[in-house]
Amino acid sequence: MKKLLFALILLCTISTLGLAHHSFAMYDQTKTITLTGKLTRFVLGANHAQLLFDLLGPDGKQQLDSNGKPIVWGVETGSAKQLAGAAVTVETFPYGTIFTVSLWQLRDGRNFGAMSLNGGRLIGCGTTFPQGGCNEKTGKVYLNGRDNPANDARRQGP
């Protein structure tokens, strides 16, 4: 009986750690922000991918901090498999790609966020800043929150 109780407690502890790893508590989910940037790094991971980018202003110009250095942001997305299912690959998003993304920023205010799942968008606009900005009218929508094809496949099951 003691072994069974110990195993149950151990299982509960381990599962809690797993849930904490996949928590979005570090992001402010009450506020979605939309940013446009120029891709500087595309990191594909087994569980999550990250897009790092230099922030662009509404005029398409690179935004600089008080020291004259580019303002760099990062966004965490789904897995490489989910992205590939939505046509987001290293080939479709090469370095220098201009894109717009909706995200939840870290609560501590650092320049990093998670792509919001409700209404979040990832829009690619190529390598030149389009007139009118990078948006659904001037670019291609790759991920669109609940409309993401990768999410549809998961919902339908085998």
Give the ranges of each region predicted by the language model.
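Positively charged n-region of N-terminal signal peptides that target proteins for export
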Residues: 1-4
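Short nucleic-acid-contacting surface segments enriched for D/E, G, S/T with interspersed K/R
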Residues: 84-101
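OB-fold/S1-family single-stranded nucleic acid-binding modules
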Residues: 106-141
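Short boundary/loop segments of OB/S1/cold-shock single-stranded nucleic-acid-binding domains
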Residues: 18-33
